[in-house]
Every structure is written in C-alpha cells, then in structure tokens.
Amino acid sequence: MSWHEVDMAADPRGGQFAYFRQMVDPFAGVTAAVDITDFLAALDGRPFFLSLLYAVTRAANRVPQLRRRILDGRVVEYDWCSPSYTLMKPDGVYVYSLIEGERTYGDFIAEGQRQQVLSLDRRTLTEDGDPLGNFFVSCLPWLD
C-alpha cells in the first residue's frame, strides 16, 4: 500500500499531534449507533454486511486524517486504507478477513465473499498485508 509522509510542522494540527503523541496510546477508535433504515431498504437482496462495509470504507477513505498513521515516529498518510474485519466461524472462533485495494462495488462484494470463504480455514486471528494501512471494522448489531 502506498503512502506519503505528512509534514507535521506545516500541518494545521501539528501542535495537537505533538501533544497527543506523548500519550501512552495516541490512537482513536470510533463507535457509533447509526440509523440504517434507508440503507436496508435500498439493499434489494444484496449482502448486508459487505454492502455496509463498502459504504463505511469509502466514507472513511474520504477523510485524509483517518488514513494517517504513525510509522517510525513519522506521520504518514495512506492513499487508500483497506477494511480488515472480524468474522465468527461456526465453532465460535473469530478470524480476520481483509479486502485489499480500492474497488468498485461489484468487485468489492465478490472479493469479500471470496475472502470470507478463505478466512474460514484460519485457526487464529492473523493479519494479512500491511496492518497499518487497514481500517479495523467490527459490526455489533446486538448492542442496541
């Protein structure tokens, strides 16, 4: 995955970065309850989770700051971040699945279905590719 270094001395948020990088865990996660009534109505038989994952991935990638990571003490911005997400196998064990690269909706769904089948053969949580260049996504519909 390609990325470029961000000049934090010239970045408007450089001071905030300098402050937060001193913290033990200077990273953020986002959890939100979202009304997806209209989204569900528009699915028309298409796979729910992969369709939602496609929409969330595209939306997150539109925000450059969400593609930024700390690599060897430097801030880098990935050109595109791929979704890595959890799947529960029939035996109750969780594994990761990854859909790499920017894709059209149809290709994303097809690759997601292929990766889910491949992921079912895994025995543990292992990460593929460059984990820094991923968005880590979990869907927990039973919490609300």
Language-model-derived ranges and their functions:
Residues 66-98:
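Small-residue-rich loop/turn and linker elements
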Residues 22, 75-77, 126-129:
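A general structural signal for short secondary-structure junctions and capping/turn motifs
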Residues 41-64:
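Acyl activation and transfer enzymes in specialized metabolism, enriched
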